[in-house]
Swiss-Prot record:
Binds 1 zinc ion per subunit. The zinc ion is important for the structural integrity of the protein. Disulfide bonds: none annotated. This is Peptide methionine sulfoxide reductase MsrB. Belongs to the MsrB Met sulfoxide reductase family. Zn(2+) binds at residues 64, 67, 113, 116. Residues 25-147 form the MsrB domain. The active site is at residue 136. PROSITE patterns: MSRB (PS51790). It comes from Methanothermobacter thermautotrophicus (strain ATCC 29096 / DSM 1053 / JCM 10044 / NBRC 100330 / Delta H) (Methanobacterium thermoautotrophicum). Pfam families: SelR. Keywords: Metal-binding, Oxidoreductase, Zinc. It catalyses: L-methionyl-[protein] + [thioredoxin]-disulfide + H2O = L-methionyl-(R)-S-oxide-[protein] + [thioredoxin]-dithiol.
């Protein structure tokens, strides 16, 4: 039996217990395009200013490209000047996991999807109020859903 974890659903406006998603690399390759696989499953980073969401200002929700978990609301998106979509908050702390990342000779805080462990990006303590956080995400790890299509 797969582990069940609490995940917040924006459409239902509540936390539900859902099964964790655990697939092999071959199974993820069948689902994702090559760039999404490289970024989300292999902790890659897209070049700045190249992702499809870094300059998107539409109203909606950003979900995990791998499993569809709600992650960020466009209301918390801001222009960080970095070239990656940046948010000052998550839709729910239930929906992400944080872990120390010591790659590239730096110590950073990696952000992962709580349901499927997809690499989303990193969080920094240089964001705007009210949180002071900057969730610096890869567009390739996200899927945007316009607010009127959330369901």
């Amino acid at each position: 039996m797969k582990d069940r974890i609490p995940i917040f659903s924006v459409a239902k406006n509540r936390v539900e217990m859902v099964e964790r998603i655990e697939l092999s690399d071959d199974e993820w390759r069948e689902i994702l395009d090559p760039e999404a696989f490289r970024v989300a499953r292999k902790a890659g980073t897209e070049p700045p200013f190249t992702g499809k969401y870094h300059d998107l200002h539409d109203d909606g929700i950003y979900r995990c490209i791998c499993c569809g978990t709600d992650l960020f609301d466009s209301e918390t998106k801001f222009d960080s000047g970095t070239g990656w979509p940046s948010f000052y908050d998550v839709v729910s702390e239930h929906n992400i996991k944080l872990r120390e990342d010591r790659s590239l000779g730096m110590v950073r805080c990696e952000v992962l999807c709580a349901r499927c462990d997809a690499h989303l990006g990193h969080v920094f303590d240089d964001g705007p109020r009210p949180t002071g956080k900057r969730y610096c995400m890869n567009s390739a790890a996200l899927k945007f859903i316009p607010r009127d299509q959330i369901g």
